[in-house]
UniProtKB/Swiss-Prot annotation:
InterPro entries: Ribosome_recyc_fac, Ribosome_recyc_fac_dom, RRF_sf. This is Ribosome-recycling factor. GO terms for cellular component: cytosol. Belongs to the RRF family.
Amino acid sequence: MSIADIKKTFEQKSARSIESFKSELQKIRTGRAHPGILDQVHVEYYGSMVSISQVANVSLLDARTISVQPWEKGMGPKIEKAIRESDLGLNPSSQGELLRVPMPALNEERRRDLTKVVRGAGEDARIAVRNLRRDANDQAKKLLKDKAISEDDERRSLDEVQKLTDRVIAEIDRLVQSKEAEILAV
């Protein structure tokens, strides 16, 4: 293991953390429709719980309406019930086999609650990145202890990892601000 390996591993893991955070943000409902919002809703299908996207075509009808077209005829009522019982606050309407899921406008209290959720998810992502930084720093200190690198190399490694950490945390903060602005936009 070298300093370059430590840096590369940190960059890869922090990129995965950001991608995970982005997918987490997509699941948070804003006033706009987004097909990914139904990914967390599961429905029973032949004895096992599966995501709605595995048993139906989920698409957008317009900016505020999601369309759900089940692939099997009997799944419509089950999907409708699963969406209604989810904690998303959605109320689907059935038109034959097609389900329309209108996105209700968010009230001010719900918007504030969602911004708190976004901030909490952002803090969790920052903690994950800080843990990655700690692991990278521990590896550099271990290399120094094993006399594989000099103290100058260790200090340089710690500085580089800190700069990468600052950049990743700034990206997370930017994503949090962007999502909050999206939620608070009326």
